[in-house]
Amino acid sequence: MPFLELTLPCTRATQPRFENALEDVGALAVTMLDAHAGTINERAILEPGVGEVRLWEETELTALFDGDSDPLMLLAALEAFDPSLDTRHATFRSVEDSAWERAWIDQFKPMRFGARTFIVPWNQDLPEEANTPDAAVVRLDPGLAFGSGTHQTTALCLRWLDALAGEGQLQGCSVLDFGCGSGILALAALKLGAANAVGVDYDPQALLATAENAERNAMEAQMQVYLPQDEPVQTYPVVLANILATALDALAETLAARVAPGGRIALSGIMQGQEQDLVQRYTPWFEHLHCEYDAEWVRIDGVRRH
């Protein structure tokens, strides 16, 4: 079934009102893009602060509605919800569901990380190499695009977990995945032998994605999810944080306090050029800090001082 796509230009100041109005009138999804994307005025927003949402000064909002929605009635409903909204520059077009949904699903293929860790879309067959008793297979819903293993930051963490399991460091332990997204790292740790895992994220939708993927992998009893303010304060033998450098810097004391003495930590989401400042930041709490590189991305791992 096709969808009706509505595109609206707005500013940083008016974006929240537009987004609320779109959701109120039945938008199935709302996305935000730089209004100058693809031009010399395009501006990247790579590093929001912890719990912060940053927007462009001029933003393009795109909303999807059921294909049988009436454009004129939608505009009237938006203006009725908030008469101050300027909808004069709204545009509509019909979008086939396969044009966006299938494109993402089709590019998500089974992937291997390290010796025995596999990430496989739930709707695809296991590759032959994953049909072994010791394979650690995580099934993910490719529609939950909070982390699928395709990005280097996630791949760096998955390879680290696989190596850790090979050393016997994961067996029977508890794992904290801070910034859990889809839950891919926590679930991989469980598949590799961890006894239980906790996923923490600022985004409630990420917690929902993690819980759904845990259920899909029959691991809901071993997986707990929390918003940061609700997380029980405890220590873990293994902690992962695949977020961004600014957040890793701001959360250094918090993350260090979560790692048990002698425990292991992996930090990812770091771009080349940012790693040395973070190594220095974490040195008071960790030793044997090591940087692993994949293209322009870096993972830092280390051992908690006693």
UniProtKB/Swiss-Prot annotation:
> What is catalyzed by this enzyme?
L-lysyl-[protein] + 3 S-adenosyl-L-methionine = N(6),N(6),N(6)-trimethyl-L-lysyl-[protein] + 3 S-adenosyl-L-homocysteine + 3 H(+)
Q: EC number(s) per UniProt?
A: 2.1.1.-
Kindly report the protein's main subcellular placement as a broad class: cytoplasm
Q: Which UniProt keywords apply?
A: Cytoplasm, Methyltransferase, S-adenosyl-L-methionine, Transferase
InterPro entries linked to this entry:
Ribosomal_L11_MeTrfase_PrmA (IPR050078), Ribosomal_PrmA_MeTrfase (IPR004498), SAM-dependent_MTases_sf (IPR029063)
Q: Which GO terms describe its biological process?
A: methylation
- GO molecular function (one): protein-lysine N-methyltransferase activity
First-level EC class: transferase
Query: Does this entry carry the keyword Cytoplasm?
Result: yes
List cellular component terms (GO): cytosol
Please provide an example of a Pfam family that matches this protein in its UniProt record: PrmA
Q: Where in the cell is it found?
A: Cytoplasm
Q: Where does S-adenosyl-L-methionine bind?
A: T154, G179, D201, N242
Similarity section: Belongs to the methyltransferase superfamily. PrmA family.
Task: Sum up the protein's function in the record's words.
Answer: Methylates ribosomal protein L11.
Any idea what this protein is called?
Ribosomal protein L11 methyltransferase
Q: Which organism is it from?
A: Xanthomonas campestris pv. campestris (strain ATCC 33913 / DSM 3586 / NCPPB 528 / LMG 568 / P 25)
Its organism's taxonomic lineage begins at: Bacteria, Pseudomonadati, Pseudomonadota, Gammaproteobacteria, Lysobacterales
Underlying gene: prmA
